[in-house]
A protein has these predicted regions:
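Active-site anion/phosphate-binding pocket segments in diverse small-molecule metabolic enzymes
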Residues: 2-15, 19, 37, 63, ...
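Active-site-proximal beta-alpha core segment in soluble small-molecule metabolic enzymes
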Residues: 5-8, 13-16, 28-190
Length: 363
């Protein structure tokens, strides 16, 4: 069947972006975040195409199990740890690293007798007030983990709340609190996310890039291209109809757009049922034949309409929704008053994925 919407993933771009991470943090190991199905890019495909990545991070056990079943053998950290003893046993069998953030998790693990050591990170809450132990508990936690022969300590984590903003006072407070809590304690440290890497906030033993790995900028005041990143996802659809609409007639649900003059409009096969946000306003750009055109009328479940005045388009033409050099995902996210993360992760099952430069094709 001919796809209505295609997400084309350039795996070479992701490899390039990993190399860019290494250039920005040359003394750190890289734990690439591939949670939420690789930020919507396909976690298995991403992992298989980063054979030199030091480790990967996912959000939950289910994501880790899927990767192990696909043959991904690199170190794999579960950022939320485990929810039950059964999950802990499964994690041990799959040789996973668990990020432990709460007393109840430690108590759960202390009751187990694993066949081989459980690999644990300890997370400290230094400012997000989301997951993590209070920093003043670090020394007690360190001794407690060291006393367990069946545990292998991987290191310490925290997460920066405001690494993407120009004013770095919050980040500096978090870094100072993390350093003070760990003074005199051993173990590798992991702090920086993509924004932290770009802003050179904390080049610790490990960095954890996420968004920048996929070629989107993690900071609002610098473009991905300016950071040397390459977009990995290009989303496109097709023009499925062309209509001539007289002056004074309205377009779409709610009649929110009225033609100020006779208009030629194009109907594009994409809508909020595919992950194109309903919140996008009139004028949101798309590209047809290299021309930048504006959306008119409300987003429907399956379709949008665009003004074809500036383009001699034809039915069947490809429509770029985001991911070209001139139409990065950040622009669409800004128009929708959301984040690039949400768009990348929000494509639905109706979108067909196509992969370019897959290392498995050249093996």
């Amino acid at each position: 069947m001919t796809p209505r919407i295609t997400a084309t993933i350039d795996l070479q771009a992701i490899r390039h972006n990993l190399q860019r991470v290494r250039e920005l943090a040359p003394h750190s190991k890289v734990m690439a975040a591939i949670k939420a199905d690789g930020y919507g890019h396909g976690a298995t495909a991403v992992a298989r195409n980063l054979p030199d990545c030091d480790a990967f991070a996912v959000a939950c056990l289910e994501e880790a199990v899927s990767l192990r079943e696909a043959g991904v053998a690199q170190p794999l950290a579960v950022l939320a740890g485990v929810l039950s003893a059964e999950e802990a046993v499964a994690a041990q069998a799959l040789d996973l690293q668990l990020v432990i953030h709460a007393e109840w998790q430690l108590q759960l693990l202390e009751q187990l007798q694993p066949a081989r050591p459980l690999k644990l990170w300890l997370k400290l809450a230094t400012g997000m007030h989301r997951l993590g132990f209070e920093p003043q508990l670090a020394a007690v936690l360190y001794r407690r983990v060291a006393a367990q022969a069946q545990w292998q300590f991987c290191g310490w984590m925290t997460h920066l709340a405001c690494a993407d903003v120009r004013d770095q006072q919050m980040s500096q407070r978090q870094l100072a609190e993390f350093a003070e809590a760990l003074e005199g304690l051993g173990g590798p440290r992991s702090i920086a996310n993509s924004a932290g890497i770009v802003n050179r906030l904390a080049e610790a033993d490990w960095v954890r890039p996420g968004l920048m790995l996929y070629g989107a900028s993690p900071v609002p005041d610098r473009s991905a291209a300016g950071l040397g990143l390459q977009p990995a996802m290009r989303v496109s659809s097709r023009l499925i109809a062309i209509k001539d609409v007289p002056r004074g007639h309205s377009i779409g649900y709610g009649a929110t757009w009225t033609c100020a003059q006779d208009m030629r409009i194009g109907i594009v096969a994409v809508g909020y049922g595919d992950g194109w946000p309903r919140s996008l306003p009139n004028g949101t750009p798309v590209e047809i034949r290299g021309q930048r055109l504006g959306m008119v009328g409300r987003v429907s479940m399956d379709m949008i309409t665009v003004d074809l005045a500036a383009c001699d388009a034809a039915i069947g033409d490809e429509v770029t929704l985001w991911g070209s050099a001139s139409l990065p995902v950040e622009q669409i996210a800004t128009a929708a008053d959301t984040l690039s993360y949400e768009l990348l992760c929000g494509l639905t099952q109706r979108v067909r994925f196509r992969y370019l430069n897959d290392l498995r094709d050249t093996a």
